Amino acid sequence: MARGKAKEEGSWKKFIWNSEKKEFLGRTGGSWFKILLFYVIFYGCLAGIFIGTIQVMLLTISELKPTYQDRVAPPGLTQIPQIQKTEISFRPNDPKSYEAYVLNIIRFLEKYKDSAQKDDMIFEDCGSMPSEPKERGEFNHERGERKVCRFKLDWLGNCSGLNDESYGYKEGKPCIIIKLNRVLGFKPKPPKNESLETYPLTMKYNPNVLPVQCTGKRDEDKDKVGNIEYFGMGGFYGFPLQYYPYYGKLLQPKYLQPLLAVQFTNLTLDTEIRIECKAYGENIGYSEKDRFQGRFDVKIEVKS
């Protein structure tokens, strides 16, 4: 039995290294060299094919603009302050209850201060009244970075923070800032005047403004919203078109989206009110799957 065990032990040792045939794990040095060379060439070819296909694909893709945008959804509409549960609840006499909302607005509007828009090599004045979309050439590097339109904070009126650092929250008249999300090359198409059946009479129509309207989401909310004031360029309730199209972070790294400020001046107290804000346009779509596509809703409660 000891002899059988020794024979078995010698057998696997001989398989690992056979000194008579100069074999390691059953192969000679030449055999190992050939098989390793085969796998190096094989995987090298696979890597070459992979890298080649990636390079060909990259040649068809522009770093400045997506090649295919036919499935890009219309831009979303969002509000500042940005909050996780889309709920704004506060007491006007308790600064701590609305401090987070105010700080969120302050941080967002930092880049809209006059001091941040001084560089004439980057920024330009595009007028104080809405006008047509401002084309800035093709999406390429030939002209370098493109200028962006300045946006003045004082256009936001009571919600600019210039005269009221609490943005209305201290008085129980909260402000929200509305923006249209960025989409490369997107040019909003405002609706025709006659197509806006629900357009409030107080809102001035302008063919160069993408209008926005905020109302009570549900029937029971409509009577509780009270008066709504809008502050935007030229006194219009929407986004002026000269800020479009957007050319992307590489060509317009300092781009400023046009803003619309909305202030709710007499909300019913101690009541959770659901408010929907909606942009209107021929190329603005809405989706039940995405509640921020072209619109958003927010719950606001002013506690006594």
Swiss-Prot record:
Question: Glycosylation annotated at which residues?
Answer: N158, N193, N266
Q: Where is this region: immunoglobulin-like?
A: 191-304
Q: Which domain of life is it from?
A: Eukaryota
Phosphoserine modification, residue list: S11
Q: Which organism is it from?
A: Rattus norvegicus (Rat)
Quaternary arrangement and interactors, per the entry? Answer: The sodium/potassium-transporting ATPase is composed of a catalytic alpha subunit, an auxiliary non-catalytic beta subunit and an additional regulatory subunit. Interacts with catalytic subunit ATP12A. Interacts with regulatory subunit FXYD1. Interacts with regulatory subunit FXYD3. Interacts with NKAIN1, NKAIN2 and NKAIN4. Interacts with MLC1. Part of a complex containing MLC1, TRPV4, AQP4 and HEPACAM. Interacts with KIRREL3. Interacts with OBSCN (via protein kinase domain 1). Interacts with TRAF3 and TRAF6.
Instruction: State what this protein does.
Output: This is the non-catalytic component of the active enzyme, which catalyzes the hydrolysis of ATP coupled with the exchange of Na(+) and K(+) ions across the plasma membrane. The beta subunit regulates, through assembly of alpha/beta heterodimers, the number of sodium pumps transported to the plasma membrane. Plays a role in innate immunity by enhancing virus-triggered induction of interferons (IFNs) and interferon stimulated genes (ISGs). Mechanistically, enhances the ubiquitination of TRAF3 and TRAF6 as well as the phosphorylation of TAK1 and TBK1. Involved in cell adhesion and establishing epithelial cell polarity.
What protein name is recorded for this chain?
Sodium/potassium-transporting ATPase subunit beta-1
How does the protein's chain sit in the membrane according to the entry? Single-pass type II membrane protein
Cysteine-cysteine disulfides: C126-C149, C159-C175, C214-C277
Asked if the Swiss-Prot or TrEMBL record annotates the protein with the keyword Phosphoprotein, the reply is yes
A single Gene Ontology molecular function, please?
protein-macromolecule adaptor activity
Description of post-translational modifications: Glutathionylated. N-glycosylated.
Residues on the membrane's Extracellular side span 63-304
Q: What is known of its domains?
A: The C-terminal lobe folds into an immunoglobulin-like domain and mediates cell adhesion properties.
Task: Identify the InterPro entries for this entry.
Answer: Na/K_ATPase_sub_beta (IPR000402), Na/K_ATPase_sub_beta_sf (IPR038702)
Subcellular location(s) of the protein: Cell membrane; Apical cell membrane; Cell membrane, Sarcolemma
